[in-house]
A protein has these predicted regions:
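Conserved nucleotide-binding/hydrolysis micro-motifs of P-loop NTPases
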Residues: 32-35, 85-88, 114-117, 149, ...
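The conserved Walker
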Residues: 3
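Phosphate-binding/switch region of NTP-binding enzymes
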Residues: 129-189
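Cytosolic-facing regulatory segments adjacent to core modules
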Residues: 13, 17-105, 119
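Helical hairpin unit composed of two closely spaced alpha helices linked by a short loop
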Residues: 98, 106-151
Length: 189
């Protein structure tokens, strides 16, 4: 999806719904920090607008009670947010393995998003090659650990100039390897 189309919201909703069912999930987020994710989840769970939470302008006792109950519910969920700003595939692999050892299983790994991974662009300017190495390594990690990985990525700008704005897998930014290494591609628009 293009920026602002809800990629982070989508992966967050999938992860929190899995966690609510008792299935451990992790999101590696290079775009938002833990506090932003917590605010998003509390807002959704308590049905209180995010801007009211951020400013602390809750005017009714019931709102404070809803936030408190929400925080208590969410604190016990098997949902892990890693907001390390500079992640490599090697770091993701190590952290996933540690979480697996600690929890026994993971229902999902979300990565927000491919273009921000440190491995991208580190191979002498060949972006497609870098992306291919990352997607191949993540595919191997998914198979090795038997865990689905939701890897968020952006679309090329060309989709905006077309009459039909419905994206296809050919619109994935910078590499056909994303399509080759994916089991499923979901596009948001």
């Amino acid at each position: 999806a293009r920026p602002g189309c809800g990629k982070s919201s989508f992966v967050g909703n999938v992860a929190i719904n899995m966690a609510r069912e008792g299935y451990p999930a992790v999101i590696f987020s290079m775009e938002m920090d833990k506090e932003e994710w917590a605010d998003r989840f509390v807002s959704q769970d308590s049905e209180i607008e995010s801007d009211l939470l951020q400013t602390g302008k809750l005017t009714h006792a019931r709102q404070w009670e809803a936030v408190s109950e929400s925080v208590s519910r969410l604190a016990d969920l098997p949902l892990y947010i890693d907001d390390s700003p500079y992640l490599t595939v090697t770091a993701v692999r190590a952290k996933v393995k540690r979480l697996l050892a600690r929890t026994g299983s993971l229902a999902m790994v979300g990565i927000d998003y491919l273009g921000l991974m440190e491995d991208i662009g580190s191979n002498s300017g060949n972006l497609a090659f870098s992306i291919g190495k990352v997607t191949r390594a993540l595919k191997q990690l998914a198979r090795e650990c038997q865990v689905p990985i939701a890897l968020l990525c952006q679309l090329n700008r060309g989709v905006e100039s077309r009459n039909n704005k419905r994206p296809t897998s050919a619109d994935l930014r910078d590499s056909g390897r994303i399509e080759e290494d994916s089991d499923v591609i979901i596009t948001l628009y």
